[in-house]
Amino acid sequence: MTQSILQSARRIVVKVGSSLVTNEGHGLDRCALGGWAGQISRLRQMGKEVVLVSSGAVAEGMQRLGWKMRPAALYELQAAAAVGQMGLAQAYADCFSEYELQTAQILLTHDDLSSRKRYLNARSTILTLLNLGIIPVINENDTVVSDEIRFGDNDNLAALVANLIEAEVLVILTDQEGLFTGDPRKNTDARLIPEVSVSDPDIEVMAGGAGSSIGRGGMQSKVMAARRAARSGAHTVIASGRAKDVLVRLAGGEAIGTILLADMPVKVARKLWLADHLQVRGSVVLDDGASRALLSGGKSLLPIGVVEIKGEFERGEAISCLDASGREIARGLINYDARESRKIMRRPTSQIEAVLGYVDEYELIHRDNLVIL
């Protein structure tokens, strides 16, 4: 399975973490960057389109600023990112030029993808760059994001980019060999899992743990990224970036690391955008009947099926739909703000006008603006 997937893939997103592009967090490792450029150039020769999601800006900024410890304050991280992003972009441009390839720097925030228009613009830009034979180098725009609107880590960002451009494979390179049955640093009996389905409930337990002090993403974030990428049909490979020529060998069909197979229904474009690219502003708790109607009946969400409103939100913003146990089962764009929603919840649609004095929509969330997770 691994061999056919990697060999047949024509569009790949490659994510390299901080530990693979820096000298243990002390500035960029130019030799490592040159190695990635060389491998990606060989993938291009194989006829594959490659988008690179690279960490390293904050680590490079810390080095240039003389900071030994990763700062906790957001404004200090943003300052380090601003300083380091210049060096990261130039270093990649220099490395890829050795192989007569041009690079393009793309910095994204969650807001860029939460707007349908900007989402499509970002997609068009990246696809145009690929058509021109240019290597897009993508990172989160750490200089301007706040905690509330950040992607979380570059594993998540890479998965969203895979969704955005409909890549067939997401390759997440890390300092670990792949997904194990347990933490190999603590359990000597832990075994590498060569292949697993993203829907396997056991993989979250196996992932456990956190990342290094250099970056933000641990194995658990990589598993969640794989599940997100699977929504657009992309398979994910988690492998060691320390393995010699790992990208070339993967593209040649060699089984390295763990492949997480996408076995989930592929979301259509608008539903995918609703599921992954909107910042959730609140949530509604549904009764059992409403949950069943959404999950099996393909129905819109009506006020009568809502038992609780959580958070504050405006009309048209994205909210989560939770079942009685608190599990998120759907996500959508709500037709009424939080104050209005609280007034009409548990009521039939025939009473909306009497309660509010007007009717904008008879549904709390129309099924066209609703995606099941």
Curated annotation (Swiss-Prot):
Residues 281-359 form the PUA domain. It is found in: Cytoplasm. One of its GO terms (molecular function) is RNA binding. Substrate binds at S55, D142, N154. SUPFAM superfamilies: Carbamate kinase-like, PUA domain-like. CDD domains: AAK_G5K_ProB, PUA_G5K. ATP binds at K15, T174, D175. It comes from the Bacteria. It holds the Pfam family AA_kinase. Gene3D superfamilies: Acetylglutamate kinase-like (3.40.1160.10), PUA domain (2.30.130.10). This is Glutamate 5-kinase. It comes from Nitrosomonas europaea (strain ATCC 19718 / CIP 103999 / KCTC 2705 / NBRC 14298). The lineage of its organism: Bacteria, Pseudomonadati, Pseudomonadota, Betaproteobacteria, Nitrosomonadales.
